[in-house]
Amino acid sequence: MLLSKKISNFVKHKGIKPNSAIMKKVILTLSVMSATLSAQAQLQTNNGIEYLQCQARDMSGDFSDLANTYFLADSITGFDFNKGEGLLNWKRYRLAPRQAFNLNGYWPVRMKMLDFPDTQYDNDPNLKIRIQKIDDRTLRVTLFTSPVEPKMDEANDPMFSPEFIAESLGNGDARLARGRWNTSADNSRIIYQNRNGVLEIQKYPFRLILKDANGKILTQTRHIIDNDSTQVKLLPFNFIKRGSDNSRSINPVFLLSPGERIYGCGESFTSLNKVGQKVNLSVVDPQGPETDGMYKPVPFYFSNRGYGIFMHTSAPATADFGASYIGAQRLFMGDETMDFFVFFGEPKQILNEYTNVTGKSPMLPLWTFGTWMSRISYFSQKEGLEIAHQLRANRIPADVIHFDTGWFGVDWQCDYQFAKDRFKDPVGMLKTLKKDGFHTCLWQLPYFTPKNRYFKELVAEGMAVRNGNGTLNYEDAVLDLSNPKTVTWYQDKIAHLIKQGVSAIKCDFGEAAPYDGLYASGKTGFYEHNLYPLRYNKALWEAVKANSPEQEGVIWARSAWAGSQRYPLHWGGDAATNEVGSVGMMGDLRGGLSFGLSGFSFWSHDMGGFVTQSPDDLYRRWLPFGFLSSHTRAHGAPPTEPWLISKDFTDAFRANAEMKYQLMPYVYAQAKDCSEKGLPMVRALFVEFPHDAGAWLVEDEYMYGSQILVAPLLESGTDRSVYLPKGKWIDYQNGKVYEGGYQHISVAEHKIPCVILVRDGSLIPQVPVAQSTDKIQWNQISWKPFKADASQCVGYLYKPGDKEITIIKQ
């Protein structure tokens, strides 16, 4: 029934005079009710998505909601260089429906506020913009959407590295000394400039313009006037105030240039180049590396045009890189503040700068680079010792035995105690394994089922995440790792295991922190969900390191967020084992490359896949990829152990393991270099060859460190096409020389079924094969030159106990 008819019937029924004061109140009341109902209906349509539990949030929908108010960045109204602060004027808009030739759409149109009392609010607010000099390649740009700045406890921000906090936040003089930027201004612009780049702030129309040192525009923000020349009325740089609750979220919009390519965003399993994709930066359990979900999203990316951006936030965000409009990067952020770190340079320089802010991966103990043997799961002391015995009996070099979900009294029931009936003497077992060169890793998770022995304690002591009613969000108790009391409790449990002789702890899960939970930090899951893996990684890493002999322990984690690279290492999750298409293997390769382009030096994956028994051919092709990754693990549904498959497969497995152990001096030196510079061990070709246009197109090959190129066989067969950057490349296995460009290479006669090529002019260190890394004979290093046109060969050496890398020339 129409509102007018409802009012008419109501008036007649009550006998109210048409122009009376009562009549005016009735009309006002019913109008408010109508508007409220309309808003609710609109919210249900545009903003009322019912997400599955812990499903990735797509924040873009909030920026097309007709119930919201839109504020468009318009002009700078003042700026103080001494403070690095100014005021940015935002114009108030709404989205207005428009019909043209039977096509319905909506355009942003100017709006006069209806807020009351109207003298107390600004129709077009002036809000703070702040620029900070961080380093000579890094600037920090912060825009606020409220006159009240949100509390930013940066000294305790888990995303920032301790070094960044100490040097850049704690000591302003040190920061300014590093961040040498020349500043200037005129009537139309504000400029920060040095030899590496330019940030130009155009006053009106407001734009943030990034330029290279020569003045070439790299990207810039969009203004409403950019819509004048197009029928597509794209929302420019804006923030919203929601009609539902007045909460705010910001939407920076940047130019996306022809030929531009975007990389990063975490361990993404889709195409490396994110242009054309819509990336949801929300931690999820994607159930494997075959979808667009991510265990390890990272709100950082960079462009082939020479700039990078770190969105300093833990709120969910959606990055639309030309998916909805081919000329724009649309960053739909859940946060109400835009806090961006902007980097200038080539990929290596940008990765170094980004990891200066969020931290670099520390150098890891030598034993971690050896073979990790596992399955889901070994259930007893006897079984673990037998696996170790078989590895040595079959002469397969290995350093780690991992016990997955089955070491507790009840499978999957994490209580931090070895099952007494199946592990008669766990400490003795750990000592026996260590004596034979094996370190031990144990599985655990941060969720506690109602039947877990610790469930009631966690709930009673307030150590689990709670909902608004004070009860649990789920049936399980999820550790609230923003609570120092919980962290202490958790670390005590881990410390007991490390003191017994365990060397590594598997940091499984961590993706299901409730979005609607209330946390001890005082924040909701909107800000804590993505932070959860980082807090989880940190708590476990600290417990393992603090209680390990010589602080040599590590973690083995599945989930991550920006800053988690400080707590290595991570693996690629539960890969599919389907042979046709090798989808799991392809997803892992893309994920590892993308992860490395997001600031993580070390990474692994389950060779052969995880879900079911790996087909023989798939497992064989996966082996070289696994052993030529920074870290190597066989894990998944049994059998993963080669001797349980066949003698021929055992020989193949051994050959791959021996190759890596021979290369361990190379691996160790490259790892050290990566840890110092924020570089990945498994790196996309363009990181090493940024001026080779073809290198930017390749996503099924990688550089293993700086000198070895690896192209796995992603399909059945013995040959494949590869792209080689300019120069000569020498086959690691037979010495054949290849020219740069596209080549079709056969490995039919190779012992290792993989294309492995060495860069011309490389000097590769090798050692005799050892059965474990503690038996490596570092005094017997030989140097193998790979030389075609090069006049000199260069190699790198870093031995355990060394302080720095030594450059060797021959």
Per-range role (PLM):
Residues 1-44:
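Bacterial Sec-dependent N-terminal signal peptides
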Residues 41-357, 362, 366-367, 376, ...:
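N-terminal accessory segment at the very beginning of proteins
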Residues 136, 144-146, 195-197, 204-206, ...:
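An acidic- and aromatic-residue-enriched active-site/binding cleft used to recognize and process polar
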Residues 138-139, 189, 198, 207, ...:
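Beta-sheet entry/capping signal
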Residues 160-172, 220, 229, 397-653, ...:
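Aromatic- and carboxylate-enriched substrate-binding clefts and catalytic-loop regions
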Residues 300, 391, 433, 540, ...:
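Conserved, mostly hydrophobic/aromatic
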Residues 380-393, 487-496:
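Short, acidic/polar
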Residues 542-547, 552-553, 560-572, 590-591, ...:
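Catalytic core of carbohydrate-active enzymes
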